[in-house]
Design a protein with these regions (language model features):
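Alpha-helical protein-protein interaction elements
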Residues: 47, 73, 155-156, 226
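Core alpha-helical transmembrane segments of integral membrane proteins
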Residues: 93-217, 221-224, 231, 241-242
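Short, contiguous, pocket-lining structural segments
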Residues: 70, 218, 245
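Conserved hydrophobic/aromatic pocket- or pore-lining residues that grip, position, or stack substrates
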Residues: 78, 173, 238
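Soluble extramembrane regions of membrane proteins in the secretory/endomembrane system
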Residues: 1-101
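Alpha-helical transmembrane segments
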Residues: 236-246
Length: 246
């Protein structure tokens, strides 16, 4: 139902909130279908009511002539309008680029497959080693161990990237809480895995299961604004401690 509503909003154009309301105390932005619900003044009203139509018209012409200069000028014009009235909440170019890379890499969706592969491989080799202790097994175990360390570093970078892009700690909703618990599971597996590789293998497998749950259809992985009720430094610490303790 949520995805159907999201698709419907996208088709209507309501999802593209590209026009900041001038001097709005809450820094609200509106989409083109919502423009008539807001009182824009003078030239601003004329601009927001016509710029998108002009842009789509130039796109059709540009497609035939293969010259997109007019379309690019209008895009720069829209960006200038956003900077003029919405600079307080407009993300930097670096943050925009970071989010694009983050979405393309899709690190957490890939990680659970790698965690599953190497966690299960480590567990299988450890079981085989009980019956036949060969030097070759020790080499494989060390290789898998350092590979898991590398995957954990990627996991940490993914969380840090999400923190940077969102502007708040990555455990503010169901999806973020689950991927954070998966990260904590691996770090404790690494700490206690020094005494037993079975601990590291088990923690990696559990983390894989947790991450796979995070990517089920009923969880939304999108990066969203923090809800006002959660906008508390101490609450973020409290949630982190409780989540990790599980």
């Amino acid at each position: 139902d949520r995805r159907v509503n999201l698709l419907y909003s996208a088709l209507e154009g309501k999802i593209m909130r590209i026009f900041p309301i001038p001097e709005d105390s809450n820094n609200k932005w509106v989409s083109y279908p919502e423009v008539n619900d807001v009182e824009f003044s003078g030239a601003d009203s004329l601009y927001v009511n016509n710029v998108l139509q002009l842009y789509f018209q130039t796109l059709r012409v540009s497609r035939e002539s293969n010259n997109y200069s007019q379309s690019e000028e209008l895009l720069e014009s829209i960006k200038g309008y956003q900077v003029k009235y919405g600079s307080d909440v407009l993300p930097s170019d670096l943050k925009i680029s970071s989010e694009i890379i983050y979405n393309k890499v899709d690190i957490f969706n890939r990680l659970y497959k790698w965690y599953l592969l190497f966690g299960f491989s480590l567990l299988l080799i450890l079981i085989l080693q009980i019956f036949n202790d060969k030097k070759f097994y020790n080499i494989l175990i060390k290789f898998i161990e350092y590979t898991i360390y590398f995957l954990f570093i990627l996991n940490t970078i993914g969380l840090a990237a999400r923190w940077y892009i969102a502007g708040h700690a990555p455990w503010s909703d169901a999806y973020e809480s689950i991927i954070f618990v998966a990260w904590a599971t691996v770090i404790f597996g690494i700490i206690f895995g020094r005494k037993s590789y079975f601990t590291l293998a088990s923690a990696t497998l559990v983390s894989s299961i947790i991450l796979s749950v995070a990517h089920m259809n009923w969880l939304d992985p999108s990066i969203a604004n923090l809800q006002p009720v959660l906008d508390s430094y101490w609450l973020m610490i409290h949630v982190a401690v409780i989540a990790v303790s599980y």
